[in-house]
Amino acid sequence: MAYQSRNNVTNYGYFRNWMFMLQRVTGVITFIFITWHVFETRVQVALGNVEHTDLGVLMHDLVQNPWVLAAYIVGLIAASFHFANGLWAFLVSWGITVGPRSQKVSTVVCMGLFVVMSVMFVLAITSFANPEFAQLPEGV
């Protein structure tokens, strides 16, 4: 879908056209990000390269690299936007928000959800840089 749809934001720079284009872009970014994240964490545990209890230390080590941290932040924000905008599209396509006023209200609510989720995810990923995650606590 991301590659088949025809974006026309240069001809018609309407808000919803931009949201349509960003939904496709963030979908691709989110797919790449989730694939990479699952490979770095769950697949490594399944292969026996990392113990499940060491995932906090692994994440600490990953976010010490500023490029990796930036990639995580971009991926998390893209996933948050993709979810929130997809929720808006779901509400419209299922006939829950039919009129212009209800669509405007749902736009504000969904974009508010995007901001809240993005802030929470960025705070969560940056917390792994805390030295407390550098090693496992005693007795674990």
Where are these regions (language model features)?
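Membrane-embedded alpha-helical bundles that constitute the cytochrome b-like, heme-associated redox core
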Residues: 1-140
